[in-house]
Each structure stands twice: as C-alpha cells, then as structure tokens.
C-alpha cells in the first residue's frame, strides 16, 4: 500500500510540474505577443502622428491677352519638369526610365554617377524641363511611377532565435548573443526618386513684334513690362488654399478640403490686330536697319480711335528667358516725348481756315521772302518762290509760310485748339508708363513760342500716340474720338470732341494728298491707293536744353488712306536715322521725314492695303 501511495504521489507531482510549465510557457508566449502588439500599436500611433493636416496653395491660372479677333497674344501653358534623386533610385527601373527619358542606359547611368559624385545641398535635380503635359515622355514616366516591381536587396539582419531560445532568454535562464546574418530580401516596390513637377509657363505666339506693348513676366510670374505689368493683379488672379492630410512616408495626400477657392486671372482683349501689328513691326524693323536709326515706332489707328498696332523696334522675344534688356521692352509710342515738327503744320492751316483767317485757295499767296522774328526764308533765291499758297506751303513744308499764317491767330485760340486736339493731356491707356507731354499755358508763350508752335516746336511736346490721335479729325469730319486699346474694359461713352468744321478738314485733307503726290511726302505714295499725310524733321533736343549740332534728327510721317472716308491712320517716328539717300538714288543725303519715315509708312501701309484680308469690324459700327 505504501509503495502504491509513493508511486501515485510522484505521478501527481510530475503532472503538476508539467501543467505549471505549460502555463509558464503560455504566459511567456502571451507576454511576447503583448509586447509585439504594443510595439505595432506604437508604430501605428507614430505613423498616425506623421499624417498631419497642412494647407497648400492652389495656383491660379494667369489670364490670356487676346487681339481684337480672339487670337492669343499671351497665354500660360501647362508644362512639366522631371526631378530625380539618384540616391534612392532602384536599379530595377533604370533601363525603362532611361528609355522614357530618351537616354541610352549608359548615358543615364553616367548622369547618375556624375550627380552622385557631386556634393549637393539638395537631393533632387532637374533632368528634363519644359515638357508638354501631353508628351509621350510624361505618359511613360507616370506609368513607371505607378508600376510595382520586384525589388531585391541584400540586407544584414539579426539572426532569428528559435522559440525555446527566446523563452529561455526572456526568463533569464540563458543569454543568446545577437548574431548578424546576410539575407536577400525581395519586396514589391514603386519607383522611388522620380518626381514630376507641373508648372505654368508664359508663352507669346507673336514673339518680339508685340513685346514692348504686351511686356513679359519675371521668374516669380509677375509682370515686369507693358500690359503684363500694368494689369498684373487682374491677369494673375488669386491663389486658393486647400487643407490636406499628408503622409510623411509616401508624401501622398488625401481628403483635400478647399479653404479658399482660387480665382483664375481675367482675360484681356485688345483692339490690336495681330496681323496688322506684325506688318507694322516688320516695316519699322526694316527701316531702323535700312537707315541705321537708334530706334523706330509706328502706331496705326482706325477712324473711331481703336489702336490696331503699336510697333516698336528694337524689341526682344519674350519667350527667350535667357536675357532681359529693359530698353527693348520700352513702348516708345507712349514713353518718349518728341517735338512733332512739321507734322503740326496741317493743324495750323486747319485752325486758320476754320477761323476764317485764310481761304486756302490757289489765289491766296503768302510772302516767303521776308524774315519774321528768328524764322528766315528757306529759299535764298527769291526768284524761285516769292509767295506760296497753303497747298504749296504744305507740299514744301515751308516754315516761313506757316508762320505767316500763324501770325493771323492769337495764342489763346491756338492753345485752346491744341488742347482740344489732346496735346498736354494723358491718354489713360497705360498710365504707369505714359508721358503725356507738355502744352504751356498761353500766358507763358512769347511771340517766338507762338511762331514755333506753328511748326511743332516751342511751347509743346507730345508722344507719338497723341500726334496720331490728332490726325483722326480727318476721318471724323473735324471731331476727335478717344483712343481705345482694350475691348473688354475701359469703355468710354463720351461724345467725340468737335475741333474743326467738316468743310475745313475736307479742304486741308486734299492739300495733304498733294503733299504725297507732288511734295515732301512723295516716298509715301502708293500705286492703286490714295494717301494723304505730312512729313516732319526735328533736330534732336539735348538734355541741356539746346539742340544737337551733329546732324542728329528725329523724322516723322503722319498720314491716312484712303483720303475720303479713311480706313487707316498711321504715324511713324525714326529716332536718329544716319543713312539716307537723295530721292530714289543711292546718293547719301541728310535724313529727313521724306527719305526715311515716309518710306516706312509706304512699306507698312502697302502691306496692309494690298493684303486683301481685312474688313475691320470696328466697335460701335
């Protein structure tokens, strides 16, 4: 009985120890699992912490600039650049990535090695830029970025302990040192180290021909010249803001919430005709080069004051971002002040005829042999011209004859008329760059001022746009409309300013036709088209107040076509032309409006009138 009891005792004792051991093992395993779960939970919490809310800017798209027919003159193109970080680029993608980027695999690897050898403060560098979003390259790169591939890498990790070793290590029975081993680990991965950065790029389809008028942007996307600068806020719009949740691991974002809605920029439509603009630009460019002038400008108007062209040369191509010369973005038609010279003589005749001081007929002749003040006879041989009619005075552009007419007028009336023609007043087209010129008050005029005012010197100066506008009286029965540059804003409903009688402008217009047919403006004459206009030549005024004695001049031609019911008005200025010729010969001659600016007028107007594609739809017509 005792033996049996002893045997049963040890059996039970062994069973108890076995059960306790099993419970201990279960406890240890559960402890390990709990620790693992806590570790994973900590990782999840850490990842959740890395997913943060942040606000990002949503760029507004800049508005377009259009011509009168809707042709785009300035627009923002969606472009892309591809950035690469060679430190994390997987070798499994290199072959296809090189192909997508249009490199050979060897070229691409050499580029990567070159970048890796450089000590750089930034990880990513631009490998391709200025790419269309619709290009094959962008499509191929986007496919690679979303593709998952098997990527294997040799890694050194801790050798995994067996379960009973882990248990014994946990309960402190025996320590097992960490052993490092090499393993080849493979995972499915997306392409790393490649980013597509999208942006907008301003594009000017007509290049340099419109640059001084349209302007350009700086690297921050703000206008730094022309209309781009003047109306920067209107064109730029307002950026929006979105609140997004981001993951610091992948950089991905989700659940975007609009905080501030973006407002894209407004479009601006001009009265400019892009084709007429190009013809005027081409003509003025040719003239500047032909006559070795410092610069040249041309403005073309419709009868109702719409500006069809504002051309300046030299001018740069705004699509070329490598250079920026501010002088080549200068809209001289509005910025440069000039003394208009003999282009003012028609207005002296208009005023005198309108006031009944002259008849402007063939039997009315003015003495051009006697000096008046500081104005001396042009022709020393008195047998050539003892007197001149109004037509002859305009044809020969005679200063003394014009002064004879001005002597019949009082300076208050002259001032009032010049003011009604817009001289000395802002055109309010692009206010920040316009220099409106000066018209002195009549009490400041001396007798000499009044005389020189008759031929565009003395108490006044102006810009080319104001001069061109004054000639609109010949297309509006003596009235003068406001100039218009914008189709979709800055509308003015005011009546035209009445300056002269209808009969007066018709009479003098025919005399200006004679100037082109048989006078100083003969180089503006065109086969098949009637032209009327007036030349001008002015000594360059120095900053000191005097005039250049080196023969430097500014030359002009202002005119219109046809003579009855004119369709186009154009004013031309060449600044300091140095290479001119006598008549139609190759003999060098001093530069005048007749042998420089009149030629530019002819070239531009000929192209426009003979193109045959223009039937202008004028505002209000």
Regions found by a protein language model. Give the residues of each.
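Beta-lactam-recognizing serine transpeptidase/beta-lactamase-like catalytic domain environment
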Residues: 72-74, 246-259, 296-342, 347-584, ...
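Membrane-proximal periplasmic segments of bacterial cell-envelope enzymes
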Residues: 1-233, 315, 423-424
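Short, Φ-rich (hydrophobic/aromatic) sequence segments
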Residues: 61, 209, 221, 226-250, ...
């Amino acid at each position: 009985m005792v033996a049996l009891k002893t045997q049963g005792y040890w059996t039970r004792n062994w069973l108890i120890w076995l059960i306790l051991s099993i419970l201990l093992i279960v406890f240890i395993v559960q402890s390990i699992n709990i620790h693992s779960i806590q570790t994973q939970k900590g990782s999840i919490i850490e990842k959740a912490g890395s997913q943060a809310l942040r606000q990002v800017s949503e760029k507004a798209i800049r508005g377009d600039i259009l011509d009168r027919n809707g042709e785009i003159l300035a627009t923002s193109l969606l472009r892309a650049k591809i950035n690469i970080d060679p430190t994390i680029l997987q070798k499994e993608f290199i072959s296809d990535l090189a192909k997508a980027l249009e490199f050979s695999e060897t070229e691409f690897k050499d580029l990567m090695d070159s970048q890796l050898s450089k000590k750089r403060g930034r990880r990513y560098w631009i490998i391709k830029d200025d790419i269309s979003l619709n290009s094959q390259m962008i499509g191929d790169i986007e496919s690679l970025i979303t593709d998952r591939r098997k990527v294997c890498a040799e890694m050194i990790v801790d050798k995994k302990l067996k379960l009973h070793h882990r248990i014994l290590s946990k309960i402190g029975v025996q320590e097992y040192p960490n052993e490092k081993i090499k393993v080849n680990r493979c995972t499915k991965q997306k392409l790393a180290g490649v980013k597509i950065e999208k942006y907008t790029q301003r594009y000017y389809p007509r290049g340099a021909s419109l640059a001084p008028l349209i302007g350009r942007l700086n690297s921050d996307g703000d206008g730094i010249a022309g209309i781009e600068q003047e109306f920067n806020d209107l064109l730029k719009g307002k950026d929006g803001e979105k609140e997004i949740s981001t993951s610091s691991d992948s950089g991905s974002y989700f659940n975007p919430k609009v905080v501030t809605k973006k407002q894209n920029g407004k479009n601006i439509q001009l009265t400019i005709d892009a084709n007429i603009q190009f013809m005027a630009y081409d003509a003025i460019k040719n003239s500047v080069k032909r006559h070795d002038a410092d610069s040249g400008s041309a403005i073309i108007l419709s009868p109702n004051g719409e500006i069809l062209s504002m051309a300046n040369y030299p001018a740069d191509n705004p699509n070329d971002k490598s250079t920026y010369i501010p002088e080549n973005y200068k809209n001289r038609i509005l910025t440069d002040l000039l003394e208009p010279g003999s282009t003012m003589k028609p207005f002296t005749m208009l005023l005198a005829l309108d006031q009944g001081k002259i008849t402007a007929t063939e039997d009315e002749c003015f003495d051009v042999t006697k000096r008046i003040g500081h104005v001396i006879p042009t022709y020393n041989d008195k047998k050539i011209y003892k007197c001149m009619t109004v037509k002859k005075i305009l044809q020969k552009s005679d200063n003394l004859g014009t002064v004879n007419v001005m002597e019949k007028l009082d300076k208050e009336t002259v001032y009032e008329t010049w003011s009604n023609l817009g001289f000395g007043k802002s055109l309010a087209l692009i206010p920040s760059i316009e220099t409106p010129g000066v018209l002195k008050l009549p009490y400041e005029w001396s007798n000499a001022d009044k005389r020189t005012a008759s031929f565009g010197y003395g108490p006044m100066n102006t810009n080319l746009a104001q001069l061109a506008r004054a000639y609109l009286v010949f297309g509006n029965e003596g009235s003068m409309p406001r100039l218009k540059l914008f189709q979709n804003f800055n509308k003015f409903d005011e009546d035209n300013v009445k300056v002269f009688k209808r009969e007066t402008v018709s009479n003098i217009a025919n005399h200006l036709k004679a100037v082109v047919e048989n006078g100083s403006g003969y180089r503006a004459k065109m086969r098949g088209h009637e032209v009327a206009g007036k030349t001008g030549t002015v000594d360059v005024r120095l900053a000191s107040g005097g005039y250049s004695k080196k023969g430097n001049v500014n030359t002009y031609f202002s005119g219109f076509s046809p003579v009855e019911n004119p369709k186009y008005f154009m004013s031309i200025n060449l600044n300091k032309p140095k290479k001119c010729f006598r008549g139609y010969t190759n003999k060098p001659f001093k530069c005048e409006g007749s042998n420089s600016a009149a030629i530019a007028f002819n070239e531009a107007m000929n192209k426009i009138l003979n193109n045959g594609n223009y039937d202008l739809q004028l505002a209000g017509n």
